[in-house]
């Protein structure tokens, strides 16, 4: 037979209120009437470990719901961004000779084009390592042609990422207001 719990102890509470390493979070509200203010940020780096670290960093940074895309195959990335309804994709370009399949700017732009074709509201940003000054002109041209929405050479600092998240949030709001206006016009017609 079990003794009665001591008064004042945390584990004496009904419902198991004892100390837990894992905090229970309520799932975010969802459904047709709920507005989603935080963008889903998909991350796709050159290795699964780097992708996980980047997604964890985004989670700690806050202001988004991070999503790690562990495959770097173009079709997989496009499919997952589309299926998960990503609002932002952060990709790492890799120009090194040590990479099995170097992911150059052209390959990243191919992914970006397909994503924007299927999810026009998704913003795509590239991160590139320092030491490749010849690549900057190609990056600027990709932004000018609106193949990508921006890039960062070197380490991505939190302020730059917050700026990109803010841009994605604004894009979400603009798309939502267009949808609302369209629905209003349909009702009037």
Predicted segment positions?
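Conserved phosphotransfer cores of two-component systems
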Residues: 82-84, 114-121
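Short beta-strand/turn micro-motifs composed of small residues
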Residues: 45-46, 91, 126-128
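Active-site phosphate/pyrophosphate- and oxyanion-stabilizing loops and adjacent acidic/basic residues
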Residues: 56, 113, 140
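Acidic, metal-coordinating helix/loop segments flanking the phosphotransfer/catalytic sites
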Residues: 70-88, 95
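Active-site residues of response regulator receiver
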Residues: 91-101
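Conserved N-terminal glycine/acidic-rich loop preference
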Residues: 50, 85-88, 134-150, 163, ...
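Alpha4 helix (beta4-alpha4-beta5 surface) of REC/receiver domains from two-component response regulators
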Residues: 102-106, 110, 123-151, 156
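Non-catalytic signal-transmission and effector/linker regions of two-component phosphorelay proteins
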Residues: 1-60, 67, 75, 158-189
């Amino acid at each position: 037979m079990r003794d009665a719990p001591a008064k004042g102890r945390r584990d004496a509470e009904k419902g198991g209120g004892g100390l837990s390493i894992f905090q229970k979070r309520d799932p975010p509200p969802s459904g047709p009437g709920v507005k989603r203010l935080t963008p889903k940020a998909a991350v796709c780096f050159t290795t699964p470990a780097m992708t996980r670290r980047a997604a964890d960093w985004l989670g700690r940074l806050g202001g988004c719901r991070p999503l790690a895309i562990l495959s770097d195959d173009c079709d997989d990335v496009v499919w997952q961004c589309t299926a998960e309804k990503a609002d932002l994709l952060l990709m790492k370009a890799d120009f090194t000779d040590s990479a099995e399949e170097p992911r150059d700017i052209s390959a990243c732009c191919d992914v970006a084009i397909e994503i924007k074709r299927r999810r026009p509201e998704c913003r795509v940003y590239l991160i590139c390592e320092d030491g490749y000054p010849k690549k900057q002109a190609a990056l600027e041209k990709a932004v000018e042609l609106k193949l990508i929405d921006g890039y960062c050479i070197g380490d991505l600092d939190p302020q730059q990422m917050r700026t990109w998240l803010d841009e994605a949030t604004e894009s979400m709001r603009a798309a939502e207001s267009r949808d609302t206006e369209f629905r209003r016009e349909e009702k009037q017609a």
